[in-house]
Amino acid sequence: MSSRGEVKLERTHRFLWSKKKWTGIPIMSANMDTVGTPAMHKVLTKYKLITCPARHFLKKGIDKFNKGESNICWFGGIEDIAKLSKTTTGFIGLDVANGYTIRFVDAVKKLRDKCPEATIAAGNVVTADMTQELILAGADIVKVGIGPGSVCTTSCLLYTSPSPRDSDQS
C-alpha cells in the first residue's frame, strides 16, 4: 500500500447467531442524546456507519427513524426487551453500564430466544472471557465501552487486567 487513501474500511460481516450478512464500516455511534439523532443518522448512513439512536427515542420516537433500516442499532436496557423485540431494524442490543452480571447474560439469552433472527449487540464489557460469555449467550456483536468516570468498573477491569507482555516476562 503506497497511500493511506488506499485503505478500505468497508467490510462484510456474517453474524454467528442471526446468520445475516451486513456490509459497511463497522463503527457504531454512541447512543447519546447529541449523537443518536435522526439528523446524525442521515449523515452516518451515507458513509455506511451504524447509528445507535439515543435511548429516549426507544421510549417515544422510533418512528423518527427509517423502519427496516439496516444501519440502525436500537439499544435498550434489560427492562426494554419487549420493546426491542418489536423493532424491525438491522440491529438490536442490550446496553448496560456493567455487563459483568449473570442477570445481563440471562437477558441476552432471553432476547435471543425472543428474536432468533435478530442481529444482537450486547455490552459493555472489556475482557475476552466476558466477550466469549456474551457470544455463547447469543450476542452477535459485543460492545466494548469504557466510561469516563472514576467509578467506572469497566475501566477498572481494563486497568487491572494483566497484559500479555507482563505475563511473558515472568
Which residues are covered by each model-predicted region?
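Short beta-strand/loop segments at the ligand-binding rim of alpha/beta enzyme cores
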Residues: 27, 67-74, 114-123
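Surface-exposed amphipathic alpha-helices with a cationic face
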Residues: 45, 63-66, 85, 105-115, ...
